[in-house]
Structures are given as structure tokens and as C-alpha cells.
């Protein structure tokens, strides 16, 4: 059924009124930047595609075509930026589970040997997808400085590609230099004999942990990592390594097209290194923070709702505490350590 001309005019008039109402009254002093594009994929079912977007103070204020943006252009000063005239634009990605501090530890303080490729500012690292290739790459990296007495750290090992790596494999790489291998999920570490000795980790201490430890294989996972974490940090790690790691992580987030991340369980506080780095003016993404629930009730009478309000009061435009909490109930997904009921993992 075709609409009458009067009905069409009324609908267009209403659209213009709504558009004007939505324009903030405080915007008059701010210039718009309009970006025409070959195509804009909005991911909004009511307007799936567009060809122009208007931005003010780093925020999108309108999306549509140059014609539908006319109310804005007539009301405010603007400039046309042709940078994306022949490009296709789409919203930024969301990474719902990223720990910046952990990313610093893994990417900036380890040699990377993973199944997937990594394209870092420092260079391209080709992935390794079999056991022989992994051990060969590890030997090559350790041999670059064979006389060093500094501990060698590597991250990215995954048994589903590289087979089970044990203390004996690492002893064959070097019987004198401490080697610490961190699994791809970071929920497991493997140490050679030299590393166990240098970190002052004893078999007696390992025996006091009921699960997550294979002493003979030098493997420590999930709860078992508590046996070795203190010794690694105290005796093996260089405290100054990875000092610029947050800048690297921020760069990788940006390069990946991610505009929102969520860190669950590890909650940076105002004034911390992570908060300061990720709340800087140059950072083009937001960080949503989902803290653990523990600790809020250490003060008598404290409530979880009070904690939420106190956290929310610290929010900025980039660092945002949510009303969610993270419970630590299970094992790592990447390492397939989740405690699954029957039939367990059905995809291998």
C-alpha cells in the first residue's frame, strides 16, 4: 500500500523534529567533523548502512547520509574530512576478556612461541604448530645467549599443538640455564631442573599442594602454580623487564581495531600503572572493569552495593567500573582445564 503525499510530508517533518531534539543544546560552540565514506556498516538493524558520519569531541553524534545530516550541518560549523571517502567503515571490536597486566607479563617479558603468528611493533613472529618445531625454536632462542645465567622465559606453549612439554625436555635444551615455559592460557608453567633449583622450589613444598602439580615433569597448573610463583618472582624475574609493556599492549589493542576491552577479575585502581596508562588522552579505547567480589566486607557493615557506588565514583571516560563481579569457579578455557561434566570436551 502506497503512502499518500501528505503522510510522507508528515513523516519527514517528524523525522526532522526528532533530529533537532536529539541535537544537544551545548553543541553550538563545537565544530563537527564529517567523514564521508564509500560505505559504513553500522551493525544497527534500523540503519544497517550509511555513507557519512559526524563526530564532535571524539564522539559520534550522527550517522546517515550527507542529506540526512543536513540539520546538523546547518546548525553548527563543520569541516569535511575526505580521509575515508573510498573506504568501508565499521564499529570497533570488543574484547570481553583481556587482562592488561597479564598481557604485559606475557608479551613484554617472554620470548613468544605460539601456534599463531604475532605481528608486533618489534617484528613478525611466525607461529609453530608441532612438537619438533616448538623444541627447535626453543633451542634456537636459548642458544642465542648460551652462556647467560639469566633465566629464560617463554610464553605460548600449547600441548594440543606442541605435545606435552616436560622438565626432561627443557633439561635437554639446557641443563644449566633456568628455563620457564608459560602455557598459552597462562594457567600452567613448566620449569627445568635449573629453574626449580634457582627458584628454591623443593619437592616437599610441591607435595603440600593436593592437585595441579607433577613434580617429576616440572609442571604446575591452576592451583599448583602457587608452589612456584613466589620463587619465580623473587629469584628469577628481572623486576625492570617489560617496563614499557603497557604501551605495547595499548598499541596492540589499537592496531587490532578494538575500541572496548573488559578486564575481569583484575581491577586496576586509580593511580595504578595500568589506570594511568589506559586513562591517558592518547588512548582510543575504553576499559570496562569487572572486579572480584571478595574483600569488600573486611570493614564491618560494608556492603557490596556500597562497593559498587565507591567504584563508580572513580569512573572516567576511559576507565569504567561496571556493576558486574567475577567469581573464580573453574579452570582455564584455553588450556581445557575447565571442570566439565560428562561428556566433557566434545571437540577434542
Q: What does each model-identified segment do?
A:
Residues 11-24:
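Bacterial N-terminal signal peptides
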Residues 2-14:
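Bacterial N-terminal signal peptides that target proteins for export
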Residues 27-29:
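Boundary at the C-terminal end of the N-terminal hydrophobic targeting segment
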Residues 2-3, 22, 34:
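Selective for proline/serine-rich intrinsically disordered segments
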Residues 31-37, 41, 45-306, 314, ...:
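Divalent metal-binding segments
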Amino acid at each position: 500500500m502506497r503512502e499518500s503525499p501528505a503522510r510522507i510530508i508528515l513523516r519527514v517533518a517528524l523525522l526532522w523534529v526528532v533530529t533537532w531534539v536529539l541535537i544537544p543544546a551545548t553543541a553550538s560552540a563545537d565544530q563537527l567533523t564529517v567523514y564521508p565514506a564509500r560505505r559504513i556498516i553500522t551493525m544497527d538493524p534500523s540503519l544497517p548502512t550509511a555513507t557519512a558520519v559526524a563526530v564532535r569531541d571524539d564522539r559520534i553524534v550522527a550517522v546517515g547520509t550527507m542529506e540526512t545530516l543536513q540539520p546538523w550541518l546547518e546548525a553548527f560549523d563543520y569541516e569535511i574530512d575526505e580521509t575515508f571517502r573510498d573506504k568501508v567503515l565499521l564499529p570497533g571490536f570488543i574484547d570481553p576478556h583481556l587482562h592488561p597486566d597479564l598481557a604485559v607479563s606475557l608479551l613484554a617479558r617472554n620470548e613468544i612461541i605460539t601456534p599463531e603468528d604475532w605481528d608486533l611493533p618489534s617484528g613478525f613472529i611466525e607461529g609453530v604448530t608441532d612438537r619438533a618445531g616448538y623444541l627447535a625454536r626453543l633451542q634456537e632462542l636459548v642458544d642465542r645467549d648460551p652462556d647467560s645465567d639469566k633465566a629464560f622465559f617463554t610464553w605460548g606453549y600449547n600441548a594440543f599443538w606442541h605435545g606435552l612439554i616436560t622438565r626432561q625436555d627443557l633439561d635437554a635444551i639446557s641443563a644449566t640455564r633456568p628455563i620457564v615455559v608459560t602455557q598459552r592460557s597462562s594457567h600452567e608453567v613448566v620449569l627445568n631442573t635449573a629453574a626449580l633449583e634457582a627458584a628454591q622450589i623443593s619437592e616437599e613444598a610441591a607435595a603440600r599442594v593436593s592437585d595441579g602439580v607433577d613434580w617429576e615433569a616440572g609442571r604446575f597448573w591452576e592451583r599448583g602454580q602457587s608452589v612456584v610463583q613466589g620463587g619465580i618472582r623473587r629469584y628469577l624475574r628481572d623486576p625492570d623487564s617489560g617496563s614499557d609493556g603497557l604501551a605495547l599492549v595499548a598499541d596492540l589493542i589499537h592496531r587490532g581495531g578494538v575500541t572496548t576491552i573488559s578486564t575481569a577479575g583484575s581491577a586496576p585502581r586509580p593511580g595504578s600503572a595500568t589506570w594511568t596508562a589506559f586513562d591517558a588522552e592518547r588512548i582510543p579505547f575504553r576499559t570496562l572493569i569487572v572486579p572480584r567480589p571478595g574483600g569488600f566486607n573486611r570493614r564491618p557493615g560494608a556492603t557490596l552495593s556500597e562497593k559498587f557506588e565507591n567504584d563508580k565514583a572513580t569512573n572516567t571516560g576511559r576507565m569504567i567500573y561496571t556493576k558486574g563481579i567475577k567469581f573464580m569457579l573453574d579452570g582455564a578455557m584455553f588450556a581445557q582445564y575447565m571442570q566439565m561434566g560428562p561428556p566433557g570436551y566434545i571437540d577434542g
